[in-house]
Amino acid sequence: MYAIVKTGGKQYKVAEGDLVKVEKIEGEPGSSVALTPVLLVDGATVKSKAADLEKVSVSAEIVEQGKGPKIDILKYKNKTGYKRRLGHRQPVTTLKITGIK
């Protein structure tokens, strides 16, 4: 059984026991969160209607809070000697899917 959930502006296909890295969700490691909205559930039959999906919940446990890979940014303007180098690491949360009900 799997579900498609939306969090942090992205959609993820999850099944029970999966580890998923998503955009930062507030909470301490070990705490549980509910992932909403659920967009689709596939068990014995596929459910995609809003009335059916209101009854479905996907629960997850926060495994760790961390940072994603570093992205290097280089700004450059020719003929002026202007150079600027920046870096960015997006905060991410690792979740373990504990149940789809």
Swiss-Prot record:
Gene Ontology MF terms in the entry: rRNA binding; structural constituent of ribosome
Keyword rRNA-binding attached: yes
Record keywords, A-Z: Ribonucleoprotein, Ribosomal protein, RNA-binding, rRNA-binding
Keyword Hydrolase among record annotations: no
GO biological process: translation
GO cellular component, one term: ribosome
SUPFAM superfamilies referenced in this protein's UniProt entry, alphabetically: L21p-like (SSF141091)
Role of this protein: This protein binds to 23S rRNA in the presence of protein L20.
Complexes and interactors: Part of the 50S ribosomal subunit. Contacts protein L20.
Family stated for the protein in its record: Belongs to the bacterial ribosomal protein bL21 family.
Protein name as it appears in the record: Large ribosomal subunit protein bL21
Organism per entry: Corynebacterium aurimucosum (strain ATCC 700975 / DSM 44827 / CIP 107346 / CN-1) (Corynebacterium nigricans)
